[in-house]
Amino acid sequence: YYAFMSQRPQKTRNGLGSGPVVHIANECTPFSPEDVTVFSNCDSVRLSVNGGPPVEKKVASCPGGLKRVPVVFPKAWDFMENKKLARGGKEGAVKLVAEGLIGGKVVVRHEVRPARRAEKIRLTLDREDGVDLYANGSDVFAVVAEVTDGRGTVKRLNDEEIVFSVEGPAELLTDSPDGTLTQPVKWGSAPALVRLGAK
């Protein structure tokens, strides 16, 4: 998704999938690669690790191929360094920060922190902006439950289950006789489909 977003125009045009983007493709887990890949449509990208000095790289293009090639910062993520800082009471300092620059100015920023202990469940509607839902008995939408730590970082590595239930004029799309839906958490999230009632 972000690889495709990095190919879009830099200038915002009527909000139609345009504008500057920078995205760190690393979840800061024990299994994340040491090399940090950043997708961007900016002129250059700055990456700072754990509050250290930023390293800036130009966003290259590939003649006859991608308009903007992903930027790779070799050996930027070190899980053992993260662990050392966390054990030393400095877990708040552990983060990757990418800034996208156009014309020498920072225009977009993305920050990634490792997830800590799971504490919350965040529910979001997965639907297009500007698309209205109607209580007509046939509109269906997806609800996504994400397991997060206290700061709101999604806990990607966990094996929990989420039990969904609905109250009011709506129903879960499920085969369960009691109307609930149990979903395993995959990569930090679990979806459910809800049909609105006719009221």
Map each language-model feature to its residues.
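Substrate-binding clefts and catalytic carboxylate motifs of secreted carbohydrate-active enzymes
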Residues: Y1-L133, G137, G150-V154
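C-terminal intrinsically disordered, low-complexity extensions immediately downstream
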Residues: T174-S176
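Extracellular/luminal low-complexity segments enriched in Ser/Thr/Pro
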Residues: L181, P191-A198
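Short, well-ordered loop/turn and helix-capping segments at boundaries between secondary-structure elements
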Residues: S6-Q10, E167-P169, A198
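Short, well-ordered beta-strand segments
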Residues: P54-E56, N158-E171, T180
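Extracellular Ig-like/FN3 beta-sandwich strand-entry sites
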Residues: E91-K95, S138-V140, D159, W187, ...
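Short proline/glycine- and polar residue-rich coil/turn motifs
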Residues: C62-G65, L181-G188
